[in-house]
Regions:
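Terminal alpha-helical segments
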Residues: 2-121
Length: 121
């Protein structure tokens, strides 16, 4: 089994370190976005719609950051210079899941807003 970390990699680990940093940026940003999304939902349920919107904006900012890094990695992959790793698969999964949750939470907050405006009818 080939290890791409440390001295086993062709470049002494420099490329993998850069890739790992990018992967952890995706994971961290997706995690921060997920936390902001659920905070937005909690705020909406409490009737704090302005605060909820701020949390949604923060989540969107974090997801854009993760997506931008993902796009850079995909470009490297198309050029054939990105080694596959389980950590990368995990990062992709975290980002995709959070993006799906964003869509669902946006709809849930919309329903909360609608119910609030209609007095629960």
């Amino acid at each position: 089994m080939t290890s791409y970390c440390g001295s086993d990699s062709p470049d002494g680990g420099a490329v993998m370190s850069e890739i790992e940093t990018a992967i952890f940026t995706i994971i961290t940003s997706a995690g921060e976005a997920r936390a902001s999304l659920y905070q937005a939902l909690d705020k909406a349920r409490a009737g704090e719609m302005a605060e909820s919107e701020q949390c949604m904006i923060e989540a969107d900012t974090q997801l854009k950051k993760a997506h931008d890094v993902q796009t850079e990695l995909i470009t490297r992959d198309l050029n054939g210079s990105l080694p596959m790793s389980l950590l990368l698969v995990h990062a992709q999964d975290q980002l995709m899941t959070t993006m799906s949750e964003q869509s669902l939470i946006e709809h849930m907050i919309g329903l909360i807003r609608d119910i609030g405006m209609n007095g629960g009818k």
